[in-house]
Amino acid sequence: MLRSTGFFRSIDCPYWAGAPGGPCRRPYCHFRHRGARGPGAPGSGGAASPASGLGYDPYNPELPQPPVQRENGALGQGDGMLELELVNQAIEAVRGEVELEQRRYQELLETARGHSAGPSALAPCSPATSIDDDDTFSLALTYTPGGLLSPDAAYQPTPLAVPAEPGHKYSLAPSDRSQGRAAGGAGALEYVPKAVGQPRRCGRPVSGGKYVVDSSKPSTDLEYDPLSNYSARHLGRASARDERATKRPRGSRGAEPYTPALKKPCDPFGGCEARFSDSEDDVTSPPKADVSSPKAGADPESKAPGKPVSKEGREHEDGGLRGTKEMAVQYDVEDLGQPPKAPDTVSVVKPGSPARASQDARVPKEGKAKKKKSGTSASLSHKDKVRKKDKKKEKDPARPRGKEKVCTDKKKLPASNPRGKAQGPEGTKKKPSSATTVASSGKGGSGRPSSTGPQDSGPGPHAPLAWKAGSAKKMSSGKLVERKARSLDEGAPQDTPKLKKRALSHAELFGDESEEEDSSLGAGAPRVWPPTLPSLSSDSESDSDSSLGLDETKVPKRLKAAPPASPVPPSPLSSSSSSSGASQCAEEDVDYSALEKEVDFDVDPMEECLRIFNESTSVKTEDKGRLARQPPKEKAEEKTHAGLTTLFPGQKRRVSHLCKPGKESEAPKRTPVAPPARPPTAQEVCYRRAQLAQRDSASWLQAAPRPTERLSSVHISAPGEKRRIAHVPNPRLAAAPTGAKRALSASSSQASHGPEPGSQPLKTRTLSGMASKTTTTVTPKRIAHSPSLQSLKKPVIPKEFGGKVPTVVRQRYLNLFIEECLKFCSSNQEAIEKALNEEKVAYDRSPSKNIYLNVAVNTLKKLRGLVPNTVPNLSKASGRRVVSHEVVLGGKLAAKTSFSLSRPSSPRVEELKGTALYSRLREYLLTQEQLKENGYPFPHPERPGGAIIFTAEEKKPKDPSCRICCRCGTEYLVSSSGRCVRSEECYYHWGRLRRNRVAGGWETQYMCCSAAVGSVGCQVAKQHVQDGRKENLEGFVRTFQKELPEDAHAGVFALDCEMSYTTYGLELTRVTVVDTDMQVVYDTFVKPDNEVVDYNTRFSGVTEADLVDTSITLRDVQAVLLSMFSADTILIGHSLESDLLALKVIHGTVVDTSVLFPHRLGLPYKRSLRNLMADYLRQIIQDNVDGHSSSEDASACMHLVIWKIREDAKTKR
């Protein structure tokens, strides 16, 4: 059956009473059974029915635990026996035991309260302590119910719900007990299950922390759970341990996850529950021992496993068997059902459960200290002792011996008094429990709860320990080896929860560390307890958080509780040693004597485990910052540390593990208050030195009065000290900026008079043992060496498969573009963006690598041409700063004038402007012959307004309607209006032909696509077009003479026009005029007289949008130009004849750059303006994909002419 969610537990079962077939016999009944359990009826609430309660208690913590226990008992008696009689029997047994336990725990509670009131440390926690005591007693009471239920054996079946049920039982039992104490009686028990047990159970199982519940509430104590077992003894320690969640109680959180445990008890009753019973006996047995007898202890044991008889037998089993069980518990906590750990736990719990009750009361409020004082000894059950012993054995077999002697001595002195004290409040109860436990062979450890028990009945604990050791040996050297390996592996992680419980888990190792911590934390409380075994338990309890954590690590509960336990690092060993040396000695004496006999002398792997444990312990303590807490530890703790330290000198020698009693005295002598101090490693030394050096330099820099000293702080010295920097003067001066150099020069001048680098001030600033160079490493002087420009992360052009230009070439030019753009761009990002755009344009315009190289070179020249604009300003500014002797002695022009006979190599360049430029340009005017050769228009001698061209070849087609395409050379027919008769696409090459020398001759190719002559054109137009300018020579105008003042000149202008194809050929669409200052004086779009067929945007840059709103006609432009120009005005242009033909203007005073810079092959070849600018002026023009710009071309012509004049002037001189 699936476990019930408990939705119907508040509804009375219709078959429970008055049913014709008798009371409800369904074990899975989801309804409430009233009167199922007398004492638990009021508290059980919805769990009254034994079967249903049993089924639900594990999962529904709210249900009263007494019913759960009954139900568990009923189920435990037989897996298949679910008869109502069994349930009734369980109920009766529970009732009787509950009453007995209530009485006994009331007495124990009073005693515990009195004892808790005694210790000063417990006083502040008295309220909590009393409550915790109730919880502790309730735990013991819980155990007693377990014992009562154990005969029923019905509890064993309950293991299905064991994780939760035990938790519930504990909760109910503690509730009942605590309430019984308050109210005193079964009624109190009933009340607790209802109010306390269920709420606590619900909250705790939900949180998954039975263990926590046990520590804080008595109800969890009454609950029986393998986890609760530890919580029972743990409750004395519960608060701390629960917080740590080292034990199963926390495991009970895992217990809900531990539902497998419930299943586990069901399938292997004896296996899973036997272990629980063992742990429970250890935990809860002491209360029973006090009240009932070993029998009661056995009953609780049977409760946990569900096999009462087997548990009693186990209790009475040989010490060897119990030792084996304890070893199993310690080393294999995961095996919940293993009985071997039962003896250990039983012996431990018997003495400690009453004390645990008191301790639990204390722990919730004060934590470890309260636990230690009030019920630490009691709370440390024999199982805890055994676990501690085992842990200590593992830690250092030699140390246990020494400790035993020392502890025995201590016990003799202070133990008698503290024992009396501890026994006073708790001793009475603890002693009966210890006696009872001693009576039972398995519970001989119970003597430990009583102060005399550990010492006088030390053989009892020793015997169990010996049994443990013997059983451990029996268990298999393999297991020990596994434990060692696990302890080694787990020793690295200091978290007990992570460790496995079978091996000396790191949790156990860590538990030892926790002991040390707890000892430091609760040293005061242990002082009250130390003489008594309870003080040992108090040590464990102070450690109980850790020691129980260790024990729990060994025990199934600790498996579950282990993860929570890790938060509470203190280990039982360390805390016990620190809390009470005497009690620790008692524990160590008992445990280590047995271990020494059986383990230490034999070549047992445990020795290595102990050595490793000790080593890891020291490391853990250091890592966890326990050093600060350890100094106040008691002498006993010091001895314990001494025993630990003895291993360090001879870590690799086994002899160190076999420390003999005589060595113990030596150990205390060299025992450091803190874990043995080890010399720092080389890395630590270097790190510390570096930190100190940095602090030293930082403080000195702050104290430095002037920034100049900071700049020269390379020499790290006192602020006012003068330093000599002979060792690093040049690099710093060379790399430092100008301001820094001045500061350095000043500081160096001071340093020249200062002491040597090894002067005393410098030594005082350096750490002892550190080279003086350390000071220089701290100085940030290398900053001066860093370049002024930050390293720029340049973009990378992605590789393109099959690209027309190699990526490497593109990347090289992109880097060059970025460098040039950085010179005039305001930011790096702007420069990168501009360079990327320029490179992208060049790549898009280049169909081949050769063309890309040309375009890239031109682009680079253009970018370089933009830089000089800013350079002159910088040079002037820098020149102003220079003050030389010549300027001072000779005046303003002294630095620029030479008084020597030798003339300067470079002549002084005159400014070319105005009349000077005009006069110089007259030398470059085209002659009449040149005008005719280049096709300039002349006035027609016969027709006014007509023009004549002397180079025009008259090609008169036979058919007047036939035209020849000027782009592809195809003949096509036109109508009278000039339109094509037939629509036909035009395939042409827009580039010029270029001849290249190849092997065996010359090769002519088109520049646009590098195709051979005669190949199909690379561009496509909608129709054919014609030039038509030379055929339409009408409408020309001629410039005329104008009178000018004597000082004036006719003017110099650069002219450029853009044309588009119309139905009658090329016509003017834009005109631009630029003066000598490169300023545009006239620029306008012109509307053609005929319909535009092709705007020729590639070359003209004119688009349809530009001419939409244009109303200026050619006649308007002619009028403007005639008003601006005269017959003597010099016009500059490239192939200016084409522009004059488009303007239909006749002008003979021109300077043509195509003639000024002729082609090497002569006419008709001409060099392009773009190439001229790139070759002579290192500037790139016409690189805009949108087409040429007439203003750019005009300005380029003006630059070329002026440059030509200056160059010629140099040669003529």
From Swiss-Prot:
Residues 468-479, 534-550, 573-583 have a biased composition (Low complexity). One of its GO terms (molecular function) is nucleic acid binding. Pfam families: EloA-BP1. Its EC number is 3.1.-.-. It is found in: Nucleus. Residues 83-112 form a coiled coil. Residues 510-519 have a biased composition (Acidic residues). Residues 38-60, 166-185, 198-591, 617-680, 735-781 are annotated as: Disordered. SMART domains: EXOIII. The keyword Phosphoprotein applies. One of its GO terms (cellular component) is nuclear body. Residues 761-779 have a biased composition (Polar residues). It comes from the Eukaryota. Residues 1052-1201 form the Exonuclease domain. The modification Phosphoserine is found at residues 277, 279, 353, 487, 514, 906. The modification Omega-N-methylarginine is found at residue 181. Signal peptide: none annotated. Keywords: Coiled coil, Exonuclease, Hydrolase, Methylation, Nuclease, Nucleus, Phosphoprotein. It is an enzyme of class 3 (hydrolase). Residues 298-325, 393-412, 480-489, 620-641 have a biased composition (Basic and acidic residues). Seems to have no detectable effect on transcription elongation in vitro. PANTHER family: RNA EXONUCLEASE 1 HOMOLOG, RNA EXONUCLEASE REXO1 / RECO3 FAMILY MEMBER-RELATED. Belongs to the REXO1/REXO3 family. This is RNA exonuclease 1 homolog. It comes from Mus musculus.
